């Protein structure tokens, strides 16, 4: 791989929160799907803070009129707080077809069914012995979130193809791999799936090795939430893995106790993985299938706590809403700072034609030669005026590719199930899920999926 795709040309720039060189050449129409979410005001603040912007329209779309109105009012406050109110016009609607025409960039953060299915996705699988920590991208919870979300996502893309076919689509909604895989099979829109796990993990590893982030160099590739840091080197080009292996071998070290699953996977398979230990454990057949393994390899919170997401998401949602209200009333400060989320940096890079490196979820098509070519992978992508261009990684080490591939088989069937609205394909998809298959028989998996479909029928129209 070319040197410019190693490390963090883009990551370093976003970490420093500075903009790219050059002026924005035109006014932009940026449309936020699922604008009632707490993510909206952060990612759109990033957009309006692009240096030398000439503004445009921020278009907010959500089917929840109450949450949409809060986002609209808060975005007005954001523009005032950062001194950009004279450049941007805010429009809001519950009808996406009203605001999609003329859109240049679509940022997707929809959440279908809100909190209504969180307990179903967790508690019904638990009856069958399947323990989940997060349960929204893989396993029974991830499957059902895909079945609820993908059909709506595809409707959005069909409208976009009709009303703004040249728009660039930036997807943040999970389950990322299934969302992007279904989209790539149905839509011709130029799109990428975005996650912050590569940025976050690379920063974390730099901290554990006591090397300034701007001095480390690394290579990372795989699938979303299961991408491997195949290289992690210091400024002299020497591997920093010996330092990490030394810490991981001492199971009482901070590194091992904070990352029980990720450090164990590194010790056995040779490289560190991008997602938190608890969430990663859901992608694997090793750590959650017996109580003794759960006791040994998981801990509280994101380190693997059973039902962590289901037990806490309603509270997190309320806290997020309370925080947004405080931002609006002035009880909390709106800071004129950009985040390290990729969205606005991609827009800036394309518009200014300044190269920027991201890690994105894209069609494989040769990027990783020993993973399914019609699958979705997470690799380094170069961004400039030509759009988002995936780079070729080559071959993953065989065992790393095999672990990714075991999940991609589930994603493949799940994407087809969501596109075709097929309950049977959904059943088959879950038989290929590594954790579920380690716990349940095929008959039990079929019964589990049927029970989930019955419980969530309100949000699954048209499935047969």
Regions found by a protein language model. Give the residues of each.
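Conserved beta-strand elements of the Class I
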Residues: 29-31
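Rossmann-fold NAD(P)-binding glycine/threonine-rich loop
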Residues: 116-185
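Glycine-rich phosphate-binding loop and adjoining beta1-alpha1-beta2 segment
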Residues: 49-84
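Long, compositionally biased stretches enriched for glycine and/or charged residues
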Residues: 210-464
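Short acidic low-complexity segments
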Residues: 89-102
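Redox-cofactor binding/interface segments in oxidoreductases and associated redox assembly factors
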Residues: 101, 107-108, 171
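Conserved glycine-rich cofactor-binding loop
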Residues: 36
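Internal, well-ordered domain-core segments that constitute the primary functional module
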Residues: 155-235
């Amino acid at each position: 791989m070319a040197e410019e795709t190693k490390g963090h040309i883009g990551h370093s720039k976003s970490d420093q929160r500075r903009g790219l060189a050059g002026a924005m050449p035109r006014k932009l129409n940026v449309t936020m799907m699922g604008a009632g979410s707490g993510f909206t005001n952060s990612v759109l603040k990033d957009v309006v803070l692009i240096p030398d912007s000439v503004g445009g329209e921020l278009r907010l779309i959500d089917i929840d009129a109450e949450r949409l109105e809060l986002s609209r009012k808060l975005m007005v406050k954001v523009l005032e707080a950062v001194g950009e109110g004279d450049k941007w016009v805010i429009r809001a609607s519950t009808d996406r077809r009203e605001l999609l025409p003329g859109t240049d960039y679509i940022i997707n953060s929809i959440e279908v069914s809100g909190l209504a299915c969180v307990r179903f996705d967790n508690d019904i699988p638990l009856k069958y012995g399947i323990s989940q920590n997060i349960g929204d991208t893989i396993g029974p919870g991830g499957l059902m979130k895909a079945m609820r979300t993908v059909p709506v996502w595809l409707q959005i893309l069909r409208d976009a193809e009709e009303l703004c076919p040249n728009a660039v689509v930036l997807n943040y909604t999970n389950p990322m791999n299934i969302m992007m895989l279904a989209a790539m099979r149905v839509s011709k829109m130029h799109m990428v799936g975005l996650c912050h796990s590569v940025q976050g993990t690379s920063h974390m590893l730099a901290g554990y090795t006591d090397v300034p982030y701007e001095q480390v160099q690394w290579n990372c590739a795989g699938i979303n939430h299961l991408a491997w840091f195949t290289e992690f080197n210091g400024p002299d080009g020497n591997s920093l893995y010996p330092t990490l292996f030394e810490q991981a071998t001492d199971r009482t070290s901070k590194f091992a106790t904070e990352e029980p699953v990720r450090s164990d996977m590194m010790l056995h398979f040779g490289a560190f993985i991008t997602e938190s230990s608890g969430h990663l454990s859901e992608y694997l057949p090793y750590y959650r299938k017996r109580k003794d393994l759960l006791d040994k390899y998981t801990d509280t919170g994101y380190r693997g706590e059973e039902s962590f997401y289901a037990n806490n998401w309603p509270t997190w949602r309320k806290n997020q809403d309370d925080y947004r209200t405080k931002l609006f009333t002035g009880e909390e400060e709106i800071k004129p700072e950009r985040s390290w989320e990729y969205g606005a940096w991609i827009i800036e890079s394309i518009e200014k034609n300044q190269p920027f490196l991201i890690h994105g979820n894209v069609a494989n098509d040769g990027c990783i030669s020993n993973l399914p070519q019609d699958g979705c992978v997470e690799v380094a992508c170069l961004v400039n005026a030509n759009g988002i261009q995936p780079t070729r990684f080559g071959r993953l080490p065989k065992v790393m590719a095999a672990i990714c591939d075991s999940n991609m088989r589930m994603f493949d069937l799940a994407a087809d199930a969501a596109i075709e609205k097929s309950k049977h394909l959904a059943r088959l998809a879950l038989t290929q899920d590594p954790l579920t298959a380690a716990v349940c028989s095929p008959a039990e998996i079929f019964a589990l999926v049927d029970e989930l479909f019955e419980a969530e029928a309100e949000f699954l129209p048209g499935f047969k």
